[in-house]
């Protein structure tokens, strides 16, 4: 819930981040859980993510809250990892997948909306964008680039 997100951001995550930053460390914030995917639930209702789905709405809300926090916003010690693996998205061809042009077209749109939400709050923290699959597929970003500054990729080796 939005109330819970604000509560724990204020009472737990911000103080934790401030502590680690005071010790000379960097902090990467990421939303809880993983991207919905096949096998994620007992009824297997998810095949992946898709434009405009409830998970994108969730991410937009979380990052809107986080990127407006006075301590977090523009803090050079805090970076944002937009989402966690596995990332399978419904492509422009109507099929779910973890690679290929059809998936990267929608991947760019999906995460560009989140980047735009963060930047729209005048928040310029470094942003780590996930790749497709198990955060190991990035080739499509050369043609379907996430726009903006201070953007990198969350690569899992």
Predicted regions and their residues:
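Aromatic-lined substrate-binding rim segments of carbohydrate-active enzymes
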Residues: 1-39, 56-65, 112-122
């Amino acid at each position: 819930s939005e109330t819970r997100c604000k509560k724990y951001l204020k009472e737990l995550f911000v103080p934790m981040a401030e502590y680690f930053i005071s010790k000379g460390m960097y902090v990467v914030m990421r939303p809880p859980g993983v991207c919905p995917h096949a096998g994620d639930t007992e009824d297997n209702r998810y095949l992946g993510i898709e434009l405009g789905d409830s998970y994108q709405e969730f991410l937009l809300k979380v990052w809107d809250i986080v990127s407006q926090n006075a301590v977090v916003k523009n803090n050079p010690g805090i970076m944002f990892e937009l989402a966690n693996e596995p990332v399978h998205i419904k492509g422009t061809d109507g099929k779910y997948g973890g690679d290929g042009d059809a998936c990267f077209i929608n991947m760019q749109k999906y995460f560009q909306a989140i980047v735009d939400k963060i930047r729209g709050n005048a928040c310029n923290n470094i942003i780590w964008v996930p790749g497709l699959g198990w955060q190991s597929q990035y080739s499509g970003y050369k043609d379907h680039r996430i726009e903006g500054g201070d953007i990198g990729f969350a690569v899992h080796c």
